Amino acid sequence: MSNQRDPRYDILFEPVKIGPVTAPNRFYQVPHCNGMGRMFPDSMIEMRGMKAEGGWGIVTTEQCDFHPTGDVQPFTETSMWDDGDLPYLAAMVDAVHEHGSLAGIELVHNGQDSGCLYSREVPIGPEHRPVTWHQHPIQARAMSLDDIRDYRRWHRKAVLRARQAGFDMVVVYAGHNGTVPSHFLSRQSNQRSDEYGGSLENRLRLYRELIEETRDAIGDTMAVVARFAVDEMMGKDGLEWAGEGKEAIEMLAELPDMWDVNVSDWDNDSMTSRFAREGYQEEYISFVKSVTSKPVSAVGRYTSPDTMVSAIRRGVVDIIGAARPSIADPFLPNKIKQGRSEDIRECIGCNICAAWNNLSAPSRCTQNPTMGEEWRKRWHPEKIAAKESDSTILIVGAGPAGLEAALGLGKRGYQVTLAEARNEAGGRVTRESRLPKLNEWARVRDYRLGQIQRMPHVEIYLESEMNAEQIREFGADKVALATGALWRNDGVGRNIRFPVPGCMALTPDDIMDGKRPATAGSAVTIYDDDHYYMASVIAELLASEGYRVTLATQGMCVASWAEYTLEQHHIENRLLNAGIQILARHQLTEVGEGWLQLTNTLTGEVSNHEGSVVSVTARLPRDELF
């Protein structure tokens, strides 16, 4: 393992001047929600400090709402409604400064998106319209000119409080179609006829005023960052990067100290790896550097230092922005700096981090189990307590749980033996990563195997199925069983509590093992009571092989839980484009030879369908050894 940085990466560690402040390198942890915020401030503070310890030159808050009319309950964000919020925000600044990084704050008012469920204030926005989040039966009122002046005053007060808390940078946010400035900018939400509506110049007026007034309030004591979505991804119905998006940047080009550019809305900006590759936003934002002299940052789930360097050298960005990669590996910058790129814990793009935030819970990460537990459990992504004994340990099963256990115990110094029945490690991760567009999920396996293979005291044995007697004979002091689970084939799941008559369906395990419905090109119904990704990827696979696929689910839509991972509508669009029929609110009630019966859960109407069944419902643990 090299301890010398590849000189190709030196450019990533050059300081960057951003107005009156200087970032120590080109790594910018952009604002990202995390489900901690004001409800769990100690957890939030420790998590942000960990990013700074790991080498991120700029570390920012999540969105920080600055007035009760922008209350975002039930989401857990930071807030700056009054001076009472200063202590925990100042503590975050101290945690970031301790490691020499710049601390930034993103001031946000969600306007017509937020229902003000806690504050009970009337939401505000450019127009009279219902609030958008959760379809609450709450109406936002159109802002008068006096309201706009009040809003600007509230924002200025928040900027001054941010300076009082010690922040180095303030982010003025007009992105994700989720803030008052972005609502004024969008033709979809602003059809005013006064000086704040109509032309692009008018719709951009409020954002210009906020940037100018932020600069006036803080002078040269803090940097001003414009976080701006250049494309609403609506085609000609919205802002487009080659049209008004570019014109807006040109109008404001030299006003901020830095541009942080992206696309709207959040589920386009943070697309999963199933739908977007690393650096996918470059086609939308690459023009920005040509129209401003100020530093430009953008995101794109960058995990490869080669891709980062390329983006800088090609003149796409000056600063690498990242949210999810900084969650998966808070020490990504330091690993590159120390010549340890092979140790990077690469983001797999599953968006479980976003899901937990959307569930109003502290974020977690598939790759980084310490995320969200830096304070409560004192977990550190790179440090772990040394072993407490000389016990030998046998782990049965080299799936993701077995690999993680072996890695953690190996780091502690234990002698570990890992036995796997199959001819390859990784378990479900290996198998699922071969399904359509899930290849990056294999990073869960690859990172752990890469670390373990450099540990002489951790041994892996493949094709080594063990029974209880063999485990006893092995003689390890401690045994951990990580033998996983198998999908049920009888239809039992969340909504069906007893086996479906006649159901001996194929399962995802069968499909991943190469089994198929008997006749190529025949009809197959995938019954989904899991409501996440699996049924849809099985549907994609079988449709690509020529089967006539129907996806039936008791949910109100396909892959309903994927709303939390920001990909439900992407999934549904892909299935429809593949010619897959979707039947929502349908329950599997009987299966026969070459046919199945579905019942509409609202009307009770029964329909018979030809073909075979794939059941994606629930799993049972492989507990033979317990």
At which residue positions do the language-model features occur?
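Flavin-dependent oxidoreductase catalytic cores
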Residues: 1-396, 400, 404-416, 424, ...
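Conserved acidic residues
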Residues: 57, 168, 257, 318, ...
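Hydrophobic, well-ordered secondary-structure elements that form the walls
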Residues: 259, 288, 311, 323, ...
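Short acidic loop-to-helix transition motifs that present clustered carboxylates
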Residues: 303-306, 327, 465-468, 511-514, ...
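A short helix-to-beta-strand connector/capping loop
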Residues: 316, 452-460, 498-504, 575-581
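Rossmann-like dinucleotide/flavin-binding elements
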Residues: 387-418, 461-472, 483-498, 502-563, ...
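Rossmann-like dinucleotide-binding cores of NAD(P)H-dependent redox enzymes
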Residues: 415-454, 530-586
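A conserved short coil-to-beta-strand element within the FAD-binding core of flavoproteins
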Residues: 461-474, 584-595
